[in-house]
């Protein structure tokens, strides 16, 4: 049976994709057949092949399997806004059955599947359904990405607590340095490590340019999962 993990973040723009690429690289190095999955993405660009989302493309590149774009990202929207808003505006409902079918298809091909969410934990997919609902439905172990900056401790603890209250496994967390480390960086890391009830899988240093394309798998200790 495939190993499956869901990557969420303490907020949008905290480095979920950077961490997801690092995790995929580490899993590939460990000998797994890996697949990244971004079931819903907004903020995509028009290309000759159709809409393409940069996060989904990064997952596609960092998967060890050769996957079609639509397999990695079945729901793609142009406007960078909450999926439930643009989905309703375009008359394209996001269906959990389609999301789950995509996951099943990847599980048939890969033995290590990483699913990346959109935004934070409770990102709405419709007026009545959130990403959290789908993850709970699928019973996916969760990896939390924390963008290390002022305010991250509270956001990390709130997210970790609600994940556990949903009855899900918080499998681990990844620290992502979204800015050059400040003078309190070490204290933030010490506090987060003490308070988050899951192992620290690794810390990805601040990378000024194209972090999704960097060799970041070396920062991840996959043995802790």
From Swiss-Prot:
Catalysed reaction, written as an equation: (7R,8S)-7,8-diammoniononanoate + CO2 + ATP = (4R,5S)-dethiobiotin + ADP + phosphate + 3 H(+)
UniProt: Mg(2+) 2 binding residues: 17, 55, 116
Enzyme Commission number, as recorded: 6.3.3.3
Residues binding ATP: 13-18, 55, 116-119, 176-177, 205-207, 212
Similarity remark: Belongs to the dethiobiotin synthetase family.
Annotated Gene Ontology cellular component terms: cytosol
UniProt protein name: ATP-dependent dethiobiotin synthetase BioD 1
Residues that, per the record, bind substrate: 42, 188
Organism: Escherichia coli (strain K12)
Pfam families referenced in this protein's UniProt entry, alphabetically: AAA_26
Broad class of the protein's primary localization: cytoplasm
């Amino acid at each position: 049976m495939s190993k499956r993990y869901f990557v969420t973040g303490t907020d949008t723009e905290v480095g979920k994709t950077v961490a997801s690429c690092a995790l995929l690289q580490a899993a590939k190095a460990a000998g797994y057949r890996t697949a990244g999955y971004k079931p819903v993405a907004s903020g995509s660009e028009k290309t000759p092949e159709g809409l393409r989302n940069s996060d989904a493309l990064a997952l596609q590149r960092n998967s060890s399997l050769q996957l079609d774009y639509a397999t990695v990202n079945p729901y793609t929207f142009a406007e960078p806004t909450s999926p439930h808003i643009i989905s309703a505006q375009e008359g394209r409902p996001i269906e959990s059955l389609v999301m789950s079918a995509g996951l099943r298809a990847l599980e048939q091909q890969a033995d290590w599947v990483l699913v990346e969410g959109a935004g934070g934990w409770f990102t709405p997919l419709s007026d009545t359904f959130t990403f959290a609902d789908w993850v709970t439905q699928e019973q996916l172990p969760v990896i939390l990405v924390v963008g290390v900056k002022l305010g991250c401790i509270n956001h990390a603890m709130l997210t970790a607590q609600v994940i556990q209250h949903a009855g899900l496994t918080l499998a681990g967390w990844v620290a992502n340095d979204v800015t050059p480390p400040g003078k309190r960086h070490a204290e933030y890391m010490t506090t987060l490590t003490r308070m988050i009830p899951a192992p620290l899988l690794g810390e990805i240093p601040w990378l000024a340019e194209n972090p999704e394309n960097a060799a970041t798998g070396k920062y991840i200790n996959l043995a802790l999962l």
